[in-house]
Amino acid sequence: MPFSELLEQVGSTGRFQVLHVTLLCIPVLMMASHNLLQNFVATVPSHYCNAHANLSQARLSLEESLLITVPLDGAGKPQRCQRYAAPQWHLLGKNGTSGSGDLADATESMDAALQECSDGWSYNSTVRSSTIISEWHLVCDMHSFKQMGQTIYMGGVLVGALLFGGLSDRYGRRILLLISNLLMAVSGTCAAFSSSFSLFCVFRFGCGLALSGLGLNTFSLIVEWIPTRIRTAVGTTTGYCYTLGQLILVLLAYFIRDWRWLTLAVSLPFYVFFLIAWWFHESSRWLALSNRTEHALKNLKSVARFNGRHEEAEKLDIKMLHESMKKEMSCTQGSYSILDLFNTPAMRKRTLCLSAVWLSTSFAYYGLAMDLDKFGVDIYLIQVIFGAVDIPAKVVVVVSMSLIGRRRSQCAVLVVAGITILLNLLVPYDKQTIRTCLAVLGKGCLAASFNCCYLYSGELFPTIIRQNGMGWVSMMARIGAMVAPMVLLTRDYIPWLPGLIYGGAPILSGLAAIFLPETLGYPLPDTIQDVEESGSGRKSKMSTKETITLQDKQANLLKQSA
């Protein structure tokens, strides 16, 4: 019997699976918190230059000190990065409490020499009592360091994907999950107590590493202990756990206004997750493929007993396990690499088009999700809206993929996302409601695009190199997430350029998706030859295979997409 039947024999949807999946899904909530933590720990508060040192002896109110120290910008607000080179005493009235407001005073103030904030800044602590921006003065000439911090974190996610993927296949899912939980807990704790921005970035890089390890091994352990028929439901549930995690972050951030305590709050639970992870059973499928059949058999018997199938546990033996793994062992024979994604014309076209789709989706998604300050709306409210919109977006795209197909759905969500981002460039800044609605629609479309990506890519890559293909496009997504924060820096030179790039990328990739074949109702390709024959229009052996339905969509996806 195949391994799937062996899993049914020990209980594929019993108490073990319910508890196993539940305990694995809980950490996903906090993974979302780490991914979007920058929105709250790196909020840029309103700020202005501190007063001159010689004003400390003067008996002036805050308003008076600000009046003679900091010039106003075009919007009538105190400038953030400059102050008068010398106090402008003439701006105070004769009684020392109010300005005279005559033309001579105004002209003299305009001609006054300005200087940088050599005595530091004062920050508004109304929204956040403390952030890494106010802690290390990452403003004015240092403002680009904010985006650098997020890029370094995403760099850790990328390196972690490359590192933990191979280690997981070599040493197992459970041990890597334990290491990842501990790494996240320790790195997050150290980040919370960092004494410098450099140390903070180092530990956030560690958090990024851990996040990849958690994602990969969590989904691997889930998918390898459940049957194909419920993988869609479980995969959807896991996705909604991530969405719920975004809302939990808002709740934590609302009550914990200090960045250090907030970072600690989203990191400490991973110590608990580390202890829980000791209970998890290693994947028997991986153990058998790694020639550790005795351990695999022991785990299967343990699962059978946990599910109340004591008689079935007694029937299991090494011979039965070997028979069930014959097919899987034959599929692992042969050597394939990422180069096989580019060696043939049809395969190369699919890979390049999917690379563009994944990169632009992640690029635009994080470009929107990590720049909440620009909307002029309460950051807690906008984060709730941005998180909640994922729920209907994912439902709509699943229905759409069943009705009009994968290709049209993928093209539509990308093009609509790009158009909404570009339209925001035309809306005046004071029309915040319209700007926010367009951004929310765009973010929802990009969340839907992620959902579509996972299914569509898994159906386009042939079985023998599906894991390599999903690994490649996932890497493209992480590169997009790394680049996204740095694009915001171009705003200093051309204010509308980031929006143009964020909006143009998904439109171009949506057009690229037109060149991909439709997969709705078609069988999964098993070999590169299947892909080439399908691309050339010749009749393929695939035509005799059983087609798949949407309910089977994540049968081969969850492991690879982690």
Swiss-Prot record:
Changes after translation: Glycosylated. Glycosylation is necessary for proper targeting of the transporter to the plasma membrane.
GO terms for MF: transmembrane transporter activity
Keywords: Cell membrane, Membrane, Transmembrane, Transmembrane helix
Pfam family, one: Sugar_tr
Free-text function comment from the UniProt entry: Involved in the renal elimination of endogenous and exogenous organic anions. Functions as organic anion exchanger when the uptake of one molecule of organic anion is coupled with an efflux of one molecule of endogenous dicarboxylic acid (glutarate, ketoglutarate, etc).
UniProt note: domains: Multiple cysteine residues are necessary for proper targeting to the plasma membrane.
Protein name: Solute carrier family 22 member 6
